[in-house]
Amino acid sequence: MARSITQRRTSLVTASLVLGVLACMSPPREANAASWQGIEPFKTHRAEVLQILGTPISESADGVLRFSVSGGSVQVSFVNEKFVTAKKLRPELAGTVLLIVLQHEHSSETPESMNLPKNKGFVRDEARTIVIFRNIKDGIVYTFIDGRLKTTRYTFADSQLSRARR
């Protein structure tokens, strides 16, 4: 026998409530830092960076690796013992990626083409011809000079730092 409209509405409301309660009870998703080419701060180790990007074109005295990539270059710096001590991090984080800096040589990207002015996750800073968009929650910073993307920085997410502490 066909169910009445009232019974169907009641079933639909009940199903919606059950789904809503289940969604609220599910554990929160872990926020991770933004990654680039599979390289993620506080997770990827030096050997993995070399495997992904190949031989660096240079290495600084403090271990920052520089690579040539399509459209520019990338610098990868690593967590060292001093940083671990200063930030009171777990010792096993030493040797993982701290910061990835992409330097774009001829990017046509603008803040508008990336929808950054409308994105509430980013804070905008401006000084003369330089505009910076920061998203501390996700660990990403874009720098624009004369309206064009010049650098993209990937670092640890805010929540990752608190989880990384001892």
Regions found by a protein language model. Name each.
Residues P27-A33:
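Sec/Tat signal peptide C-region and signal peptidase I cleavage site
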Residues A2-L17:
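Bacterial N-terminal signal peptides that target proteins for export
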Residues T44-R166:
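A cross-family detector of function-defining hotspots
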Residues A34-G38:
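Short, recurring structural edge motifs at helix starts
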Residues M1-A2, L22:
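Helix-centric, low-specificity signal for extended rod-like, repetitive segments
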Residues T14-S26:
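Bacterial N-terminal signal peptides
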